Amino acid sequence: MSLEEKKTTESKEKDKALSLVLGQIERNFGRGSIMRLGDASRMKVETISTGALTLDLALGGGYPKGRVVEVYGPESSGKTTLTLHAIAEVQKNGGVAAFVDAEHALDPVYAASLGVDVENLLVSQPDTGEMALEIVDQLIRSSAVDLVVVDSVAALTPRAEIEGEMGDHVIGSQARLMSQAMRKITGNIGKSGCTVIFLNQLRLKIGVTYGNPETTTGGNALKFYASVRLDIRRIQTLKRGTEEYGIRAKVKVAKNKVAPPFRIAEFDILFGKGISTTGCLLDLAEETNIIIRRGAWYSYEGENIGQGRDNTIIWLDQNLEIRNKVESMVKEKLTEGTEVSSNSMKALNSNPANTIAVNDIKTVA
C-alpha cells in the first residue's frame, strides 16, 4: 500500500469515527449539542437597536441577541433611560420584554413617554437577589422573552444580608451570588436568544493612588461573562438660557465580543422624552454632508433650515417629510461605507482610532 493510499484510508477511518461520536453525543445530549460552526443557522449575531443611531453604529448594530450586556455609570447618567429605549424597540418589533426592578424605582409614566408599552411590559420587584436571579433564569429558559433588564446589580441583596441585622458583615456574598447566577444562566441565554442587560453602579476602591479607582459592584463574574460592557457618562447639561432641558451623554464601549471595542458614541437625552433620535440623525447628516453647517446656520439642499443645533432639530421634527428623506439618505450613505466618527462629533474626528467604516459592521437594526 502506497503512502497516499494509507493516508486516504486513515482519513476515512477518522471521518467514520467522528460521525459515530457526533451521533453518540447528539443521542445523549440532544440535537444541536455539538455542530460544525459552518452548519450554524445564524452565523451573524442579530441585534436589538439601542434607540440611538450613533450608539448602534458604535456597537456594530445594537445589543447582540443571546448575550449578556452590562451598562454601568454614575448616578443620573442615563442608564435606565438607555434600557427603556431598548425595551421600546423590542416591543415595536413584536417582541416581549421584562424589567426586573430590584431598586423598586421604575416610573411607568416616564417609561410610557419613551415609547414603552407598559400594559404588556413584564415587571418584577423581587425581595431578594436570589429571587430576582431565579426569575431571570426562568424567563430565559421559557424562550418566550426577547429582552430582560435587571436594574440593578447593586440592589441584588442576598437573602442572608436581608435576614441579618444592620451592621452584620456578609463578606463577598453578593459576588458569590452573581458568580453562581452567571454560570447558571449564560448557557440558557445563548440557547434562547434572549438578551439580558444588567445595570450596574460605580464604587470607589479605597487606597488607590494610581490608576482608575472606580469599580462596579457584584464582583468580577459579570465582567467576564458580559459580551458587551457600556460605560455611560453625563458630559454636559443642555440649557436654554437658565432652563435645563436635558443632558449630553457619552458612551464608551469598554468591551465588545461581537464587534470592535473601545468606540465612543454621544447623544442627547431630553428630560421627560428620552434619547433625541433627531439629534443623532442631525449629527450623522452633518458628518455625511447631507446637512451642511456654516457657522451657526444649518442648510439642506442650499437652503438654511435653522440657526443653531436646537432650532435645526425643532425644524426637522416639524418637517417630517424632509426628516424622513434625510434619514433615508444618511442610511444609504452609511450602507455605501461612508466613514463617520463613532461619536459623531467632528471635533473628535482627528483621532483615526475613533473612525469606523459602516460597511465593515452589521446593518443597523
UniProtKB/Swiss-Prot annotation:
Its main location: cytoplasm. ATP binds at G73, P74, E75, S76, S77, G78, K79, T80. One of its GO terms (biological process) is DNA recombination. InterPro entries: AAA+_ATPase, DNA_recomb/repair_RecA, DNA_recomb/repair_RecA_CS, P-loop_NTPase, RecA-like_C, RecA-like_N, RecA_ATP-bd, RecA_C_sf. It is found in: Cytoplasm. Can catalyze the hydrolysis of ATP in the presence of single-stranded DNA, the ATP-dependent uptake of single-stranded DNA by duplex DNA, and the ATP-dependent hybridization of homologous single-stranded DNAs. It interacts with LexA causing its activation and leading to its autocatalytic cleavage. This is Protein RecA.
